[in-house]
Amino acid sequence: MTITPQQLIALLPLLIVGLTVVVVMLCIAWRRNHFINSTLTVIGINLALLSLWFVTQNGPMDVTPLMRVDGFSMFYTGLVLVASLATSTLAYAWLAGYPGNRDEFYLLVLIATMGGILLASANHLAALFLGIELISLPLFGMVGYAFRQKRSLEASIKYTLLSAAAASFLLFGMALVYAQTGQLSFTALGQTLNDTMLTQPVLLAGLGMMVVGLGFKLSLVPFHLWTPDVYQGAPVPVSTFLATASKIAIFAVVMRLFLYAPVTHSDTVRLVLAIIAFASMLFGNLMALSQSNIKRVLGYSSIAHLGYLLVGLIVVQAHTLALETVGVYLAGYLFASLGAFGVVSLMSSTYTGEDADSLYSYRGLFWHKPLLSSVLTVMMLSLAGIPMTLGFIGKFYVIALGVNSHLGWLTGAVVAGSAIGLFYYLRIMVSLYLSPPENLRRDMPSNWALTAGGVVVLISSLLVLLLGLYPQPLITLVQLAYPIL
């Protein structure tokens, strides 16, 4: 097939990130310079973000049988690129004290970003699998990048082994779906699947295995066991990427699959997803109550947040509000997570020391760093879904969608989960304003707000507050980000 200029423009973000990978690789071969390679990475991701404007002017289209570029893919590509940009920026300070080769970290981030962009545009089960592998394989290396530290190496081994098992489930599930339908394209599956076919045991087994594989990647109960350990063991910038870019990209492709293929018309699939959502909301929040490590708290809370999002996934075919709900919620979750992990990253010393991830490290922080404490407070309020933050707008959408779709018990679980969540978010906030311990030494620089990581954290907190007070620009953007049906 011949590729037209319009198709090349549609692929611009992917091509620019791919070109950045090549440039950074050549630069490493020529001369190792941490500052130059990190700058090239940030420039490449910014150019990819700018190229989205040209893609918008180009209009929606099917670029290849595997990829469909439309408003939906552009919105989620933008979110993935923002998460990657924040990860690269936060990683610079952490890598400054790293004794080994630092530059390869940026290559891994860029390759994983390509996987995220591919997932946002995927319109085919082959593209779904390629995208998931392209985002997962670099993450194995990123999670274990601090391999001299036992916990990082342990987290990497856990994630690699469980991820390989989940990928085999996903692939076998796809094979069963293909055996029953003879189709791999999302749109073709939508035309082929009907109510009688959705009762076939082979097809249900295939869909079940796909749910297992995707549930692992999204850390949904009961496939969540790796999440707190990996979040705690991985370097903070990697935990940031894992919690944001990876989850957003995979949820976007699952939304598109469920939107095109009428999978949720099957009562069995709906019931299974509803049980997973219910368990994720309650289990994620209840387990976070007993944690004294902030990275583990954020890990368990991410399980609960993905549980809330499943409400949108269950009714995505029946309700036009579902796409809007998921878009607003994921944007709020992205900025709140970037801010929260950003504060942990700024508080942690460079590679040489331990991450400042125990709640004890944050006790009395307000009396030393009032602005940083205020930022973390805003992020916790947003994650808890308190009014005047972007997190509240997302939570409000989820509850409204649940009520409109007559999902009474799931809506009740969202409210109950949010109430439980408020307790452990408040615990973190209260510790910031207690009297500081005498013998606690903090390594962070006094001018943190002027560092690149500080700018990321401040921008995230401003967006959480401004869009929480006036969410209309985000809602308009999400309404424009509608897939071709």
UniProtKB/Swiss-Prot annotation:
The keyword Repressor does not apply. It comes from the Bacteria. GO terms for molecular function: NADH dehydrogenase (ubiquinone) activity; NADH:ubiquinone reductase (non-electrogenic) activity; quinone binding. The chain crosses the membrane at residues 8-28, 35-55, 75-95, 105-125, 127-147, 159-179, 203-223, 235-255, 271-291, 303-323, 326-346, 371-393, 406-426, 449-469. NCBIfam families: NDH_I_N, PRK05777.1-1. NDH-1 is composed of 13 different subunits. Subunits NuoA, H, J, K, L, M, N constitute the membrane sector of the complex. This is NADH-quinone oxidoreductase subunit N. It comes from Sodalis glossinidius (strain morsitans). The lineage of its organism: Bacteria, Pseudomonadati, Pseudomonadota, Gammaproteobacteria, Enterobacterales.
